[in-house]
């Protein structure tokens, strides 16, 4: 039978490992960290990565139950975020759930580290209503604190319909972000693929 203290030790070991690794990479010159990606990790859960119309393009439907968008930062995630701000590292909120993003903003405000937050590759929620994309209040928050939102060049995240007109939606997304948050907020954020249809 597992001892509950073993779980605590394991959790503490994970936390210590996460913070040690973070400091190691910071000391090697790593400037920022993307806290979440396609699958849950020790820090934060991700949003489901595909719009409903794209489910037919892969085996994503069978994986739907693996994402819980009602989750926020883990305890380890909170400690990592606080340590990042203490070190002065930048934090990329791309792929984080809305609940995790809200908590990151709160921690940033508490530590006076708002300028450390950015989104490297996202869209605008009002252009394509996916929880992956930033809502208007988040875009304004970034604008008020010197942050940027890199526009992803991927139709799945910037277009509400299955289309080949990617450039049109890039333009709409940039225009929307400028109208909501100012011209200093939108940036090029192609992600690793750097493409649109």
Residue map of PLM features:
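Extended, charged catalytic domains and RNA/DNA-binding interfaces, predominantly
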Residues: 1-187
């Amino acid at each position: 039978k597992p001892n509950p203290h073993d779980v605590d030790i394991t959790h503490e070991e994970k936390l210590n490992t996460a913070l040690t690794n973070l400091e190691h990479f910071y000391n090697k010159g790593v400037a920022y960290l993307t806290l979440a990606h396609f699958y849950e990790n020790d820090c934060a859960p991700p949003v489901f990565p595909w719009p409903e119309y794209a489910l037919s393009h892969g085996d994503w439907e069978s994986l739907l139950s693996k994402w819980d968008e009602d989750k926020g930062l883990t305890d380890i995630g909170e400690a990592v975020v606080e340590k990042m701000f203490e070190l002065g590292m930048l934090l990329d909120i791309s792929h984080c759930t809305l609940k995790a993003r809200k908590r990151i903003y709160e921690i940033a405000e508490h530590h006076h580290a708002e300028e450390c937050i950015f989104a490297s590759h996202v869209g605008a929620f009002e252009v394509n209503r996916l929880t992956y994309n930033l809502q208007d209040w988040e875009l304004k928050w970034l604008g008020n604190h010197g942050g940027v939102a890199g526009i992803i060049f991927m139709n799945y995240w910037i277009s509400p319909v299955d289309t080949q007109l990617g450039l049109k939606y890039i333009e709409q997304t940039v225009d929307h972000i400028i109208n909501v948050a100012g011209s200093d907020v939108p940036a090029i954020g192609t992600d690793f693929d750097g493409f649109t249809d």
